[in-house]
Regions:
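Conserved alpha-helical scaffold segments that buttress catalytic/binding sites
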Residues: 59, 63-401
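Intrinsically disordered, low-complexity, charge-rich segments with an acidic bias
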Residues: 30-33, 104
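Positively charged N-terminal leader segments that act as targeting/secretion signals
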Residues: 25, 42-43, 48
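Hydrophobic alpha-helical signal peptides and transmembrane signal-/tail-anchor segments
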Residues: 1-11, 18-21, 32, 36-38, ...
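Residue-level detector of alpha-helix boundary/anchor positions
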Residues: 4, 8-11, 28, 204, ...
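Residue-level recognition of conserved structural "scaffold" positions that shape functional pockets
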Residues: 17-18, 33, 219, 280
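Short, Lys/Arg-enriched N-terminal segments with co-localized hydrophobic residues
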Residues: 46-61
């Protein structure tokens, strides 16, 4: 029923793409891993939509002999786990995408950095020591979409440079095709990601996204929007991400929650650690009639300096959320010492343990966590620190879902 509803809301080619993807994965019944083998292209408004034809590679099933105390074995999955997609309860979908990054690039390689960092994470989590037993499996981002992304980076950089030197104001028509190509690229990636989320959800999996920049979670909310399930969002970030557009990009990382708020069943957006925003965003917050609630970083710090506890603030944050919650974590919500190479670092922010405490309070509240994303992790040129921290945040998110 879900697919018929979705087909009626989108174009024929997009619907066919999603249907083919669903059918291809429907054969993955016996402990298999999906590998992209070839693609077929079809026209959509003179652009292309990637249609994947999948082959299935049998994996060795998870064995009772797995030693969670040992070092990660060569060729193992995320966190060194040997489980298959079928065995795993939690699926992580990597999204290698950063077309609108406006400061430091590198988040496109965030999923790989987190995967590598996960090999250094001991599996006995302090709060959720058995989370590894649930099984965590990391999906694959299609090579064809990564190639599409990389092919559009020059257009993105040309637009951003033209904005900086004023050329785009004098000759806007020169950049219309670039904007259109980037928007079409987003739509192709979004179609794949919606189908992927829908597939794993139909299999009863818990699903988390791993970006990439913060533009990437929009399809998750579009999927939730089609379920007509009312929910709220806990958004941890240095930035409000409520701009109508940024640098002319409709799907900018700075516009993710402006776009998400168009989805009617999003009851409330609760933002934490915010410390960088524009006048337009502040006005939207003030005029939201309580739909957007912000716990600004400076206000949180002031209250704590004056004797308020982090526990009390976290209780207020949790109480602001409805019973069903989606969690969106931009790594730059943390102090930059924990994510020095992220796309747009801002002084201040949460300590690592403050974030862990807040996430635990969500879990303890009994609220249902529908899904999550972790975005904006960016590896340093000669450092694995960002990936190490990101892997630990991701592991904790797996513990609370």
């Amino acid at each position: 029923m879900f697919f018929f509803q979705f087909f009626s809301s989108c174009g024929f080619h997009v619907a066919r793409y999603i249907y083919y993807t669903y059918l291809a994965h429907g054969d993955a019944a016996n402990q298999t891993k999906i590998k992209q083998k070839q693609i077929k292209k079809t026209s959509i408004s003179k652009k292309t939509l990637i249609l994947h034809v999948f082959t299935l590679q049998t994996l060795k099933p998870m064995e009772n002999t797995f030693d969670p105390n040992a070092a990660a074995a060569l060729g193992s999955g995320i966190y060194g786990l040997p489980c298959t997609a079928e065995e795993a309860e939690i699926i992580i979908i990597p999204v290698e995408w950063e077309l609108t990054t406006s400061y430091n690039r590198g988040t496109v390689d965030g999923p790989a950095a987190v995967f590598d960092g996960s090999m250094q994470v001991d599996l006995c989590h302090h709060d959720y020591p058995d989370v590894w037993k649930r099984g965590i499996w990391m999906d694959e981002f299609p090579e064809e979409l990564r190639e599409l992304h990389d092919s559009l980076i020059p257009a993105s950089e040309e637009i951003i440079e033209a904005i900086g030197n004023g050329d785009i104001d004098e000759n806007p028509q020169d950049y219309e095709e670039r904007y259109k190509a980037i928007e079409d690229g987003f739509e192709q990636m979004f179609a794949w990601l919606r189908a992927r989320i829908s597939y794993w959800k139909s299999m009863g999996k818990k699903v988390g996204l791993l970006g990439g920049d913060h533009s990437t979670p929009l399809p998750y909310h579009q999927y939730l929007g089609m379920t007509n399930e009312k929910y709220g969002i806990l958004h941890v970030d240095a930035h409000s991400d409520l701009r109508e557009q940024f640098e002319g990009f409709k799907y900018s990382h700075a516009s993710i929650f402006y776009n998400v708020l168009k989805i009617k069943n999003v009851e409330r957006l609760v933002q934490v650690a915010i410390r960088d925003y524009c006048h337009q965003e502040k006005q939207l917050i003030n005029e939201s009639d309580g739909r957007v609630v912000v716990f600004y970083d400076r206000d949180n710090r002031r209250r704590m300096y004056e004797g308020c506890t982090w526990k009390l603030i976290c209780d207020e944050i949790v109480d602001s959320l409805p019973e069903k919650v989606y969690i969106s974590v931009d790594i730059d919500g943390l102090d930059p010492k924990l994510c020095p190479n992220t796309g747009t670092p801002v002084p201040g922010g949460m300590e690592y343990e403050e974030l862990m405490y807040l996430l635990n309070k969500i879990k303890e509240s009994g609220k249902e966590v529908l899904g999550f994303d972790l975005c904006e992790v960016s590896p340093g040129e000669n450092s694995e620190w960002d990936g190490n921290v990101g892997a630990r945040v991701l592991y904790h998110l797996c513990g609370i879902i």
